[in-house]
Regions:
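Walker B catalytic acidic pair
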Residues: 37-38
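Conserved ABC ATPase signature
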Residues: 1-19, 41-46, 112-113
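GG-anchored amphipathic helix commonly corresponding to the ABC/SMC/Rad50 NBD signature/C-loop
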Residues: 4, 12-34, 53-63
Length: 156
């Protein structure tokens, strides 16, 4: 017998199903902001890049998709996968700091907008690399993303 999806699907599977539905119904959906929390759960880099491309397309920014009736959405995505994060037009990091407050401690959340240079450093860390070769890999990945965004490269 069929069971409720909430009982059998992981959070990542549910998010990817939502992405598939939103991608299919984007032209008819007027929801201004879509939030995906760890949609990369259980997937690798190659699939992560494809998911990143699909999320980016939901913004209506893909060639031939803006201005032709497609609903443009603001997409917020929480991810740990650099291949997916590379598709973002803006990149933020979120960190937590423990602050001493008298005898107690308080957790403080910090959201930081990354510059282009800081973004490369963050994506390199997300890749698990700390070398110049890792940095070059990130720069190459961002170059490929730029090609996808202009329509010069198609991911399969």
């Amino acid at each position: 017998p069929l069971k409720p999806m909430a009982r059998v699907a992981s959070g990542g599977e549910t998010a990817r199903l939502m992405l598939a539905l939103k991608s299919t119904l984007a032209h008819a959906d007027a929801t201004p902001t879509l939030i995906f929390d760890e949609i990369d759960q259980g997937i690798g880099g190659r699939v992560g890049a494809i998911v990143g491309q699909k999320l980016w397309r939901l913004t209506g920014a893909a060639p031939g998709e803006n201005g032709d009736g497609a609903a443009a959405h603001q997409v917020l995505c929480i991810t740990h996968l650099p291949q997916l994060a590379a598709f973002g037009d803006h990149h933020y990091t979120v960190s937590k700091q423990i602050l001493a407050q008298g005898d107690a401690e308080r957790t403080h959340t910090v959201v930081e907008t990354l510059t282009a240079e800081a973004r490369i450093a963050e994506l390199t860390q997300m890749l698990g690399a700390h070398s110049e070769a890792g940095r070059r890999s990130v720069e190459e990945m961002l170059g490929e993303v730029a090609q996808v965004k202009t329509g010069a490269l198609v991911l399969n």
